[in-house]
Amino acid sequence: MNTFQADWGEIPQMPKDQVFTPQDQLTNYNDNMMDNLLDFNYNDVDALLSEELKDLDIPLAPSPRDLNMNAEQSLNWMQDIQGHRSNKPSMSHKRGMSGTAIFGFKNHNKTLSIASFSKNTDIINEAENENVKGNTDNQNGFVLSQVLLKQQEELRLALEKQKEVNRNLERQLRENRLQQEHIQRVLHDQEAVTSQLTAQNVTESPSKQRSPTKYQGDDAIIVTKNSSSGGYVFPPPPRVTLNNEAVTPPLSFSRFSNIDQMESSDPLNYLQPNADFTEAYASHKTPESSFGKEHASVLSTSEFLRPTNAARESSSKAMYSSPNSMISPHRKKDSVLSTVSTILQPQDDYQNTASPPSQMLNLEEANLENEQKNNGKMLRAPVEIMPTIPGSKNNTPMTANKSGFMPQKHTFQHTPVKAKNNVDMNERSLVRPELSGTPLNKSVQNGMHFREEDDSNILHHISEIPQGSTSHNNTTAGDDSNVSNRLQFSNTESSPSRQRKKPTTLPPGYIDRYVKELPDKNFECLFPNCGKFFRRRYNIKSHIQTHLEDKPYKCDFEGCTKAFVRNHDLARHKKTHDKHFSCPCGKKFSSEQSMMKHKNRHNCTGPARVPDSKMVSKSPRKQSSPTKLSSAIMNSPIKENYLKENTNLHIDQLRMDPKMRNALEDGGLLKPVERTEAMAFPSPLSGYSDLGSPFRDLGTIEE
């Protein structure tokens, strides 16, 4: 582009004072309009075209505005053009082949190369890009400014909200501070009042501090607690009226934080003339009885309630006036008010103390007893039938008072329990009975124990144990009644009865190790190499006891050392010791077969021996039961003498073979049994069914 301007600069210019004609003005006007319409400079287009024409080796003619130049100048211009054409090299692409073949030139290619135009286009594009970039930057700046303004507005709103929250917090803090100051003032006032009250209590006299509270109603009750023994003592010592002045032994009471809230009421007194309380107390004993107004008069006319002896009055006042010299029957405790229904129980706190109040009460009881005897109305204390309360000093059944009047002191509990007998026992001597053999017979000799897994049920079935089976180290022959009472008491106090566990000499739960309960309610033995199944737990436990050689049932017969797993096995064994079969030589046997063997061994002086080969062998199923046969023989009073002499002989005849018996009879060695009316021998049982009826055989022999 600069090259073109330099080239055009060599063209001779028109003088400045040259005057343009109207035609020239019109031409200039048209040129200006074209420049304005096409929006580019005419000189630039001219230079562009001139450059392209030079590349195409096309000679250039002067422009119309240069027509007024003189000839010399024109010639010079032509020469300059030629010289410039010959001397100045091409600035485009070293005059390479251009795409001018479209114009019909020879040896020209079809590739169009317009370097200057592309450069100009690049310049225009760069300018446009700069304009677009500037516009984009302006737009981005506007958007950014809008965002910043919006954020500033949001921050301003948030700041205002935070200021409002801060103001609310400050207001709450001020209110809390005021409340705390008010609470501190109230606490300070309360502390001041408390300190004043404490100072007043400290400066009070001991008698005022220990003065009892007065109850509002007659049915109010003092419940004492925090005593040395941990029990409750009720009622307080009675008030004694001396010259119309009520004197009450002091009773300690708990200090309340606010003394104004303490209730005042009179202590309960059994000896004061109060008919309503007397009726209420009598109804506690028996609802049907009436302990009413007539007895109130008896109490009011007591000599002790209005004594005339001045010495007694002075001694009583001296006793209650000084708290140091007085012996209070109450232990140190705190008392509170309660209206809970109570149960009274005496307590022997005054047995070993000869205090003046107890002596005075004894005198009072004696006077009341005399007056009641005179009036024919003897009253008994209703509390003698009350049960023992846990927590009292002595848990023994109370007995009637000698004077027949109220006891001196009582204990208070909410829940009564059964009384316990005052009988010395050795650490559950009735709880774990020692049993052996039959559990209900002779249970001490062999030392077999019932092992209970649950101690809460150890007293069940205790009534089944006979008196001879219990052993006590301190029990004498005169305590049989106490033992029976103790057994009865254990029965009533025991937990619900449960079936006794199976006796065993093994530790608890040892047998269960070998028991496996199956889903089908069967049981499998887990003992090595066993694997048997049972349908009942009792059976499998007995089976396992045979594996473990656990035989708790021992025979108590003298000289017998056998033991069994089951009780019925022991019972069957004991029958072997019952010898109902006696030999003429004096020996006794438990079975007939044993007796016959004895006779056949030449050890007996009885009848002749029968050969063993001739003995009739019977099936064990058909042998008679020795118990049934012996009972049939021994229970017949008509044939007692006859059977005593002839039973053994008759049995021998029945045991013989018929042919053997006939041979002996023919030889005169065996005398047949005669038929008599006295011979009403009972028919043999099933054991002799194979021989038939003995009378039929005898009848055959006689024939």
Swiss-Prot record:
GO cellular component term of the entry, any: cytosol
SMART domains, sorted: ZnF_C2H2
Keywords in alphabetical order: Cell adhesion, Cell wall biogenesis/degradation, Coiled coil, Metal-binding, Nucleus, Repeat, Transcription, Transcription regulation, Virulence, Zinc, Zinc-finger
Zinc finger extent (C2H2-type): 523-547, 553-577, 581-602
Residue stretches of biased makeup (Polar residues): 197-214, 312-327, 466-497, 622-634
Knockout mutant characteristics: Leads to systemic infections characterized by fungal escape from the vasculature, tissue penetration, proliferation in vivo, and considerable overstimulation of the pro-inflammatory arm of the innate immune response.
Subcellular location as annotated: Nucleus
Annotated GO biological process: cell adhesion; cell wall organization; G1/S transition of mitotic cell cycle; negative regulation of transcription by RNA polymerase II; positive regulation of antisense RNA transcription; positive regulation of septum digestion after cytokinesis; positive regulation of transcription by RNA polymerase II
Any Pfam family the entry gives: zf-C2H2
Coiled coil regions in record: 148-187
GO molecular function, one term: DNA-binding transcription factor activity, RNA polymerase II-specific
Top-level division of the source organism's lineage: Eukaryota
Location of region: Disordered: 197-216, 312-333, 465-509, 599-635
Described function: Transcription factor involved in the RAM (regulation of ACE2 transcription factor and polarized morphogenesis) signaling network that regulates polarized morphogenesis. Regulates expression of genes involved in cell separation or other cell wall genes. Required for regulation of morphogenesis, cell separation, adherence, biofilm formation, invasion, as well as virulence.
Name the UniProt record assigns to this protein: Cell wall transcription factor ACE2
Taxonomic source organism: Candida glabrata (strain ATCC 2001 / BCRC 20586 / JCM 3761 / NBRC 0622 / NRRL Y-65 / CBS 138) (Yeast)
Source taxonomy: Eukaryota, Fungi, Dikarya, Ascomycota, Saccharomycotina
Encoding gene per record: ACE2
